[in-house]
Amino acid sequence: MTRLVNNPDNFPSQAVAGLVSAFPNHLRPVFGGVVRAARTDRKVALVVGGGSGRYPAFAGWVGPGFADGAVCGNIFSSPSASQAYAVCKAADRGAGLLIGFGNYAGDVLHFGQAAERLRSEGINARCLLVTDDIASAPDHLKRRGIAGDLPVFKVTAAACEEGRDIDEVVAIFE
């Protein structure tokens, strides 16, 4: 497989910069990822994220009718808690914040830390864990999130766009 990479150490930031330069009216770069360029206040915000390397996930999912922000870690590695916090803070619209990710140890830890910090600041932040990979474990709470991320986040985002409150959106997700 041929790869076009300037420097593997800078891959996520360069990929985000390229995406933002291609869609400057739709995306805005922030530390750790991207958020929508246009803000819709007083709606539940959805931030998605995880390791980079499987594009268009996750930055390519940001836009109207989908996510409000995306946290982009290194290639196949979880983003840091500070990256998750920064993207979530920038994506917050004042009606609660949902953070969606697959069931990977680093993501659970780092997105969970970001949510705790946001809650300590008075933001109603909740984590949405996708556990669709039936091949990875028999117990659904131990399954990873793989292909199911896309449809699960899309349905969740549609509920956010409709203006539903955070409890309704979480119920739809579950």
Residue spans of the language-model regions?
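N-terminal amphipathic/basic leader segments beginning at the initiator methionine
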Residues: M1-L46
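Short glycine-rich or small-residue beta-strand-to-loop segments that form or flank ligand, phosphate
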Residues: T2, V44-G51, A67-A70, G96-A105, ...
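Glycine-rich, flexible N-terminal cofactor/catalytic loop recognition
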Residues: G32-P64, V71
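Glycine-rich oxoanion-binding loops at beta->alpha junctions
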Residues: R54, F58-G94
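Short glycine/serine/threonine-rich phosphate/pyrophosphate-binding segments
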Residues: Y55-F58, S82-Y85, G106-G112, A135-P138
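Short, acidic/small-residue loops that bind anionic groups at enzyme active sites
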Residues: A70-I75, R119-K142
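Internal, active-site/partner-interface "lid" segment
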Residues: S136-I146, P151-E174
